[in-house]
Amino acid sequence: SRAGVIASLEPIINTLKNESKKGKPIFGICTGAQILVESGLVPGTSDDQTSVALADNKRIKSGEVVGTGYYNAWSNLKLSVPQNSTAFTRHLSENEMINIPFAHAEGRFIIPDDLLEEMKTNDQTVFRYCDYNGKVSSEFPTNPNGSDYNLAAISNASGCLLYTSPSPRDNRV
């Protein structure tokens, strides 16, 4: 079964849903992101159904899969929405890049094309993997897990929920 499925059925999820409706910020990292995805809180479709998946990593270079599963490295992320779109990015600059640890096996965002287009329109595609110059590329190592649209973090439409597969909590700086 997918990571986060069982936890997404726990009673605490109803509390998180109620608090998010009040606009309270909720930040899901790694397994927390998987729980938010499985609960339907993010991206927050009207029926709270699971509409996004976090799948096994696939490192792809020149159209070939060069690795799968667990990967650990530092990643560059680029803010790809206006900074006031979420409670978590309001102090960042437009197109700001951050460098954070990446350490997981199941963080590859898979999103249906129609939902991805809706999320882009709603400024929910918050951070995308990029290289040191800010260029977004689907090639490994820039995109370390093969995520659709190079996504590293997405939010709900109101911006109070953010989830990310890279793990800023692992930053020892």
Residue ranges and their predicted role:
Residues 155-157, 162-165:
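Cell-surface, membrane-associated systems
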Residues 1-84:
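Cysteine-nucleophile active-site neighborhood
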Residues 71, 78-157:
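Catalytic beta-strand/loop cores that center a nucleophilic Ser/Cys/Thr
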Residues 34-35, 108, 171:
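General alpha-helical segment detector with a strong preference for membrane-spanning helices
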Residues 163-166, 170-173:
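Single conserved hydrophobic/aromatic residue that forms the stacking wall/gate
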